[in-house]
Swiss-Prot record:
InterPro entries xref list: DNA-dir_RNA_pol_bsu_external_1 (IPR019462), DNA-dir_RNA_pol_su2 (IPR015712), DNA-dir_RNAP_su2_dom (IPR007120), DNA-dir_RNAP_su2_hyb_sf (IPR037033), RNA_pol_bsu_bac (IPR010243), RNA_pol_bsu_CS (IPR007121), RNA_pol_bsu_protrusion (IPR007644), RNA_pol_Rpb2_2 (IPR007642)
HAMAP family assigned to the protein according to its UniProt record, in alphabetical order: RNApol_bact_RpoB
Record bears the keyword Nucleotidyltransferase: yes
Organism from which the protein derives: Caldanaerobacter subterraneus subsp. tengcongensis (strain DSM 15242 / JCM 11007 / NBRC 100824 / MB4)
Biased composition range(s): Acidic residues: 1192-1234
Record's catalysed reaction(s): RNA(n) + a ribonucleoside 5'-triphosphate = RNA(n+1) + diphosphate
Pfam families reported in the protein's UniProt record: RNA_pol_Rpb2_1, RNA_pol_Rpb2_2, RNA_pol_Rpb2_3, RNA_pol_Rpb2_45, RNA_pol_Rpb2_6, RNA_pol_Rpb2_7
Protein's recorded name: DNA-directed RNA polymerase subunit beta
Amino acid sequence: MVRPVQAGSRTRMSFAKIDEVLEIPDLIEVQKKSYQWFLEEGLKEVFQEISPIESFTGNLALEFVDYRLENNPKYSVEECKDRDTTYAAPLKVKVRLTNRETGEIKESEVFMGDLPLMTDKGTFIINGAERVIVSQLVRSPGVYYDQQFDKFGKKLIFATVIPNRGAWLEYEEDSNDVIYVRIDRTRKVPITVLLRAIGYNTDIQILDLLGEEEKLKATLDKDTTKSEEEALIEIYKRLRPGEPPTVESARSLFNALFFDPKRYDLAKVGRYKFNKKLALKARIANHKSAKRIVNPITGEVLVEEGEKITREKAEEIQNCGINEVEILVDGKVVKVVGNNTVDINKYPMPYDVSSLNIKELVNVRVLREILDNFSDEEAVLNEIKNRMDELVPKHITKDDIVATISYQLNLTHGVGFVDDIDHLGNRRVRSVGELLQNQFRIGLARLERVVKERMTIQDVNEVTPQNLINIRPVVAAIREFFGSSQLSQFMDQTNPLSELTHKRRVSALGPGGLSRERAGFEVRDVHYSHYGRICPIETPEGPNIGLITSLTTYARVNEYGFIETPYRKVDKATGTVTDEIVYMTADEEDEYIIAQANEPLDENNRFINDRVVCRLREEIISVPPTEVDFMDVSPKQIVSVSASLIPFLENDDANRALMGSNMQRQAVPLLKPEAPIVGTGMEYKAAVDSGAVILAKNDGIVEKVTADKVVIRTKDGKRDEYHLLKFKRSNQGTCINQRPIVNEGDEVKKGQVICDGPSTDHGELALGKNVLVGFMPWEGYNYEDAILISEELVMDDSLTSIHIEEYDAEARDTKLGPEEITREIPNVGEDALKDLDERGIIRIGAEVRAGDILVGKVTPKGETELTAEERLLRAIFGEKAREVRDTSLRVPHGESGIVVDVKVYSRENGDELPPGVNQMVRVFVAQKRKISVGDKMAGRHGNKGVISRILPVEDMPFLPDGTPLQICLNPLGVPSRMNIGQVLETHLGLVAKALGWYIASPVFDGATEKDIEELLAKSGFSPDGKVQLYDGRTGEPFDNKVTVGYMYMLKLHHLVDDKMHARSTGPYSLVTQQPLGGKAQFGGQRFGEMEVWALEAYGAAHTLQEMLTVKSDDVTGRVKAYEAIVKGENIPEPGIPESFKVLVKELQSLALDVKVITEDGQEIPIKEFEDDDDDVPDATLNINIEGREDAPPEEVYEEEYEEEPEELPEDIDFEPDNFDIDSEDLFMDDDYDG
């Protein structure tokens, strides 16, 4: 059953039983396709919407005729990253200004700002940082019906009309059968008022329009208005309470609210949803007709009275222009009114309109008008093109309003259905292109205001397009979107998989979406319509669960923004599965019966079983083969890329699979990547689509290979050069390094992998290491998921990773003169300067530790007023060395490493720098981090733990042939967690290693227990996969046999080096004078309320006293205590803590006179700590490592720099809760989306 498959240059033995009928699509197509649409269509739409901009008088008009994007960005992607600039290209727009009085036309090209470009990896470079725009899942515009029950159990129907932008219409019923409407969330009016306002004046007209409905009659009784004018005034009063209503102003307001495309927009998708829901065909199908229905054009009888209307007939009835049909429901006649739309390609017309390629339904009134007025084909086709906006209106129409009300009345009789808002047919994806288009539209709307104002101010004859247009609002809108939108995120670049899944992420949060607090359980839950569209597994744990999800492997987004998934069509007549692939959205899929991908087929693709297990909406049903409509394409179609990389996913509990797919994104790239022995076959596709590897652009022969360049000579003699990235820093500080995997003289094909990137091995994703594990406890070192590892993994650098930190030093202009980058630093010995060059910048290759100088820099100090004598001496003996202080860039606490790169930017060399900065130096320091105690490791099945001990190789348990284990895991971690996949992986890994195989075991279609048992027996292992182990310390055999094998283990980004932290003295908070908290602020460990109780319980009075005074906020006491420790004296009595003084001040602010009195009645003066307190010993003790302990950051900043700081460091005052490092930190899979 096992067969070899090729993945890149490696052959894997695949256990898959199902043939792949469809290639997995390009995984970052979502991003690329959407941005491409924005450049080609999106921009055009926005410019067309806003053109022409007319002056208030109407004699000037400004039109945006055309636009182009120059295809030469100023810097390449790599240069932009180095220079902290944005990768963008100038947008040029052709503008036409028409003077309608004189007929004069001025045309010119206007620069409209730089538009950020998408890199070929689907990301943007904004200010040097790589960012991703996450797609957003929002409610689709359209009309939604909902039912609720009042306290008497009576069914009430509610409807909401949601446009893309514009006023909402909400229809509601009360218990007395009166239907009301709310316009734009204002007070409600009876529905008949709205009907009168759109032209149905009298009660008879209304009843005639919608049928003699009880609810309509009850509503008419409630309605006080009697004509269109009264109705308009009634609506005006609701919308503009307090303003005097006139019929004219009421009519113009009402029309502007709903029928002005600038104010009201359904968007393409809204129109599509409206027509789908309200058109006749879906509503009358499968009901009996109450009357004979005749085609008004041909006179043909379509349906006889009492005959059941089939789907095909219903479509025919609608497409011949019939808009009202009466049907029989339980013996009652119910009138169904559509929204007057037809499919133009099926409407009986004398001309062929297929060349126009109109997919949407069109308004039949406008169509008839065109056909009546024009007689020859060319004129009709032209008129149809010109009147597209009327045929397919973007705003709501009167027909739509009538159809909405008709649908609501029909629902009372059980005709139609209510909507489920969590169904993916009612939620759509807004990708980059659309989000960007909306931002651009906002910018242009602001620009329009400016242009109109300028048109009135400037002289009509002198005016030019350039001086009318101010591009500032457009540029600002785009900058704001990329810089600070919730959906523009700093790319997760830990490894190639995290990049890939970040680009495929779908978020329900963000502007126009949900908020974490408001989102209930239903929105977050897995829905049956997610099948094949949104992964049920990959979502963060914590407050964002279910709100942030991932697209599945085969999913794609259609033009309306709905997620589609592919199916194979089944020929119902013969029960044969064809190779025809159909992509379907969630609401289309609801109509069909769909078989699973693993349903057995014979060699002719016929179903083998008599009954086929299928899905129909949320039901699982069993049907004969002739009733099946479609079949899944692949078993992995229901999961995302991350989840499809977990072998034996089907044997893991869903909660653990979730952790497994999230933790793969946190694996750090290792020094020696190694592809998994037991994979799923998805590793190659994931690595290639992530953009981490380099692919050959053409066929050819490798001419030259060096560490950072590959040259390939193509068939036609051209040379392709490929430049590799060497030891670059990723967004997360991991190392990006590419290595060639071809040799000189090799023949390569187009699309072949020629260079590996981080975490890839021969073109396959390689996030971890294959290690020999045994499931056995060892001396309690596996307690609570802890992991015992062998020293071998440390010595061989098996789990070693490289991390690169970036440090910046800027030389600015200050009030007292410019800062200077120099080697001449006051009070620093030559020893500290040994690695600096003559400019004062560290040399590449230097090894640095915490506190070492990276860039020498001095800042001028304020000079005191000189006396006359000093000035005289100064004049005679020349300038004394100017007073400067040392502000060098030093390696922060706890950091060390080797300098791998230094970049210097300065004004003189013409580099762009922020205002006030003359020179900038950027130093990159790399660290090699071996695996160490406290690091977090995990498998792919959610089995995570922290390393508790590193044991010498000779002490590890060993196999009968003397091979020592590399890792011991706790067997108790398996049963309760129900992730049995790890055990199967271990067994299969053992066999594969013995046979020298690499294995592909795809999800839901991989190796079975039987397959593994057979292989174990064949390879000479015990069929239960257990081995006798011996104690490495004594050589004695253990009592029981142990499960041993190869498992793929990942080293995660939660490294102990980043979490370790210690402090003796450091910065203090401003108000409370207590130490700050957290590693980033170099803070202390919080000794909280509960810890105080513990010391109180033990009666440890002295410890408790110093905890609360000299170790915290007794300002004088801590200085004296430090001095005493340095001098070796006894520590003096503590004073009054600052927090007590703060408390006293707060009480005094409540007008309570608080005094502190000693036992013998002496009053103690309470004075808040100030800089110039006399009783503070000399500050030369250099207690505060971080500079002046009491100065607010603003002051320090202003002394050094001329301008005000833009943002203050946030360590001025901290909430007391974030002081202690939470032990949970190690186990929280922190998802950056949170």
